[in-house]
Amino acid sequence: MPEPRGSSQLRVNAAFAARYNRYREREELQRLKDRYGDRDSSSDSSSESDSSDERVEFDPQQERDFYKTLSLLKKKDPRIYQKDATFYNRTASSSDSEEDPEALEKQKKVRPMYLKDYERKVILEKAGKYVDEENSDGETSNHRLQETSSQSYVEEQKQLKESFRAFVEDSEDEDGAGEGGSSLLQKRAKTRQEKAQEEADYIEWLKGQKEIRNPDSLKELTHLKEYWNDPELDEGERFLRDYILNKRYEEEEEEEEDEEEMEEEEGVHGPPVQLAVDDSSDEGELFLKKQEDFEQKYNFRFEEPDSASVKTYPRSIASSVRRKDERRKEKREETRERKKREKAKKQEELKQLKNLKRKEILAKLEKLRKVTGNEMLGLEEGDLEDDFDPAQHDQLMQKCFGDEYYGAVEEEKPQFEEEEGLEDDWNWDTWDGPEQEGDWSQQELHCEDPNFNMDADYDPSQPRKKKREAPLTGKKKRKSPFAAAVGQEKPVFEPGDKTFEEYLDEYYRLDYEDIIDDLPCRFKYRTVVPCDFGLSTEEILAADDKELNRWCSLKKTCMYRSEQEELRDKRAYSQKAQNSWKKRQVFKSLCREEAETPAEATGKPQRDEAGPQRQLPALDGSLMGPESPPAQEEEAPVSPHKKPAPQKRRRAKKARLLGPTVMLGGCEFSRQRLQAFGLNPKRLHFRQLGRQRRKQQGPKNSS
């Protein structure tokens, strides 16, 4: 059930009531000021406002006294328990300013001198008489001369001594006199920047971030510094240290002032309200305006504030600018440099290996020269330093180990001097090599062995006599030089040694084009079957390119094929080249050159009795018919009254092979060939017919 209306209590907003009362007091004060005027001086009001607005600043000497007292407390010094002990002293600057009025005058700003001030000074000091500086200097100098001339020498010396004594006394009393002492030497006052720098160094020294040159004056604060810089300092003491040294109490004061300003702004919106209100209606309007503002804030408290205004935020360059990230690029460059170094190292190792292999080959070559007895073997050191060339390698091997090397035969029979005491009647079929001297102590025969010598005078250490067959005749023959050469000891062949060609192949195999993944990559060469396609070198050089292409296309010559396919093509083209008639049909330029050779020698075309049936020289030098195939070598004799039948057959066969032809430059070309070159064969054919008609009509017109 709802509660009765009488039991409900009325609650009053205390903060709003206090602000309203303060507002009413200001309003009443403003109304009285407007009516009776402001009786107080403006200076007092300004001083009060300044004193209220200005922030309380701590004296640096007071801060040092505070740190000194805190250090004594942390150290638990016995002086803190004394009753008469004082830890805070009044600063010299404040005491001097309060006691000495002259210090207050010096602190005031120096008033600039205007023209009126200068005129007033002249009237008061010089009785209104303006005197130039030059004249005044002259007057003072004349006055001094008059004084010196009136004084005697003793008086002058006495005056100088007194002035010197006064100067010495002033210099001795300078430290104690302070500002009232001699004006010759004055203590320089520190500037504001120097004082601020000293305070900053002092704070950094307490933080342990900097050292001070004269730490004697801060000897009492050493314990506080060590206490605050202890790494095991607890959290509370660390917070107190940071709060005092970083002056965070000033930040709190600024925050409080900002909060007060925000409250004042929130309390009153719009233009400032005049406090001077003469009528009560104005008070009601102001109250209603505040009420409306409060209702609007309460009703729209869940909406976005300041939705009607477009907010703009300044750009923070440090956070908005994109930082240049080149870590991946640097990583790639490092990887590239590392691979480059590894590649250079690998190349150096391969180069060293190649040099060692070259030395080994040169040693093998020197040994080969000694064995063969050929000092000019045909292979020099420069041949090994060049790049590998397969054709040059084959020529080099053919030059060194060709047929001349293996098939060399001595032209003259060698003559050997016969030596006495040697017999040449030996049966070399039963010769079993040179007899080696055995060590009888290592392998001694037993008396029961079948080969045991029963002779008592037998000495195993002596060389055994050579076995020989009895000569057929009773004469004693000498040993031939061949027998002496065969009987010499020969080096045993080592099957593990490589041939010289294998050494060269292994040396050239060390060359490479590039190194990929620590592996030297090189082109692989293979041995192909040599094939001339049934043509000689002269025919290949003298023939036209188109004729060579008709005989064998360039695509087929450069095709990569297996060895069986190359052998098959070699046999096919060798058989194709044996057909001389077909060869002449393809290589017409070669046949024409051979046919024109005798005509150029005599100056007249050579024709036989048959006329058109002239013989054309073949490619191999033999004379054959111009168009007859090789199968029709024997022809029947042709009667002089009838045209020979084989000539018609030859023309018909030629027409079937080439089709309708056109003569151009003394050569016959088929229409398909002219069309392949982009020419119009019909037009050329009609031009040829027109020329023939004009030639035929020429003799008729002349007759």
UniProtKB/Swiss-Prot annotation:
Coiled-coil spans in chain: none
Modified residues (Phosphothreonine): 91
Region (Disordered): 27-63, 83-111, 127-193, 249-284, 305-351, 412-490, 594-665
Chain positions with Phosphoserine modification: 93-95, 97, 136, 141, 163, 171, 280-281, 309, 622, 628, 639
Matches recorded under InterPro entries: Kri1, Kri1-like_C
Record flagged with keyword Phosphoprotein: yes
Keyword set, alphabetical order: Phosphoprotein
Gene Ontology cellular-component annotations: 90S preribosome; nucleolus
GO annotation, biological process: endonucleolytic cleavage in ITS1 to separate SSU-rRNA from 5.8S rRNA and LSU-rRNA from tricistronic rRNA transcript (SSU-rRNA, 5.8S rRNA, LSU-rRNA)
Any one GO MF annotation of this record: RNA binding
Compositionally biased spans, kind Basic residues: 463-480, 640-656
Start-end of Acidic residues biased regions: 251-266, 417-438
Signal peptide interval: none
Ranges of biased composition (kind: Basic and acidic residues): 27-42, 52-63, 155-168, 322-337
UniProt similarity note: Belongs to the KRI1 family.
Protein name, per record: Protein KRI1 homolog
Biological source species: Homo sapiens
Originating gene: KRI1
